[in-house]
């Protein structure tokens, strides 16, 4: 797979670099305490962890985290959410936070109403139960119970917060097609690597 550079992706940095006052740094002791509960962070290098801490500070400064349906979140839990959501940004920087402003958190899986029109023109309406959702130019939505399940078993291979943030990165260029904003020179290599990995995945599950 094509590897993103350790530093910010140049295109994102140039397109989405915001001339804003830096957010206040996170309390070092609070970060250390939070880190103990997020084993995914234990594998990070010191450099990557420092970058993640800075990104998490930006996340908490710029995003409104709204618990719903009677859920209450303390500062440590909000920091957990910020850290998980910012893990996919380690290769692209704070520009990956652009385009949305609110994280909604339900206590557990939530239901949404769906509809679609089939080939015969018949409208079908139904309820769908979700553990996370990312709206184009809208909020990111998570189930707190499933975030906690991911923290309890972090190497299972799925993390709903990371998954939904990947959709936010995908949408940065205006097209939800599995490809985040990339320098033109990387686009062909990205497509080839993505197709190769997808084909390998299909072989495993077929």
What do these predicted regions represent?
Residues 157-173:
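Catalytic glutamate of the conserved HExxH
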Residues 65-72:
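Short, surface-exposed loop/turn segments at secondary-structure junctions
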Residues 2-32:
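Charged, compositionally biased N-terminal leader segments and the immediate start
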Residues 17, 21, 30, 35-42, ...:
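Metalloprotease/metallohydrolase-associated module, dominated by Zn2+-dependent proteases
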């Amino acid at each position: 797979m094509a590897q993103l550079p350790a530093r910010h992706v140049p295109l994102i940095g140039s397109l989405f670099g915001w001339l804003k006052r830096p957010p206040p740094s996170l309390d070092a002791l609070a970060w250390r305490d939070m880190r103990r509960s997020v084993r995914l962070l234990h594998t990070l290098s010191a450099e990557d962890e420092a970058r993640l801490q800075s990104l998490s500070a930006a996340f908490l400064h710029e995003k409104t985290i709204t618990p719903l349906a009677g859920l209450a979140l303390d500062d440590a839990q909000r920091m957990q959410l910020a850290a998980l959501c910012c893990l996919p940004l380690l290769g692209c920087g704070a520009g990956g936070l652009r385009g949305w402003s609110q994280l909604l958190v339900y206590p557990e899986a939530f239901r949404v109403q769906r509809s679609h029109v089939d080939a015969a023109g018949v409208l079908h309406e139904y309820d769908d139960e979700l553990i996370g959702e990312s709206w184009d130019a809208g909020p990111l939505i998570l189930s707190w119970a499933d975030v906690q399940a991911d923290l309890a078993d972090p190497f299972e291979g799925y993390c709903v917060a990371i998954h939904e943030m990947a959709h936010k990165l995908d949408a940065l260029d205006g097209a939800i097609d599995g490809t985040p904003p990339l320098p033109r020179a990387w686009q062909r290599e990205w497509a080839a690597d993505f197709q190769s990995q997808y084909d390998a995945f299909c072989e495993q599950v077929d």
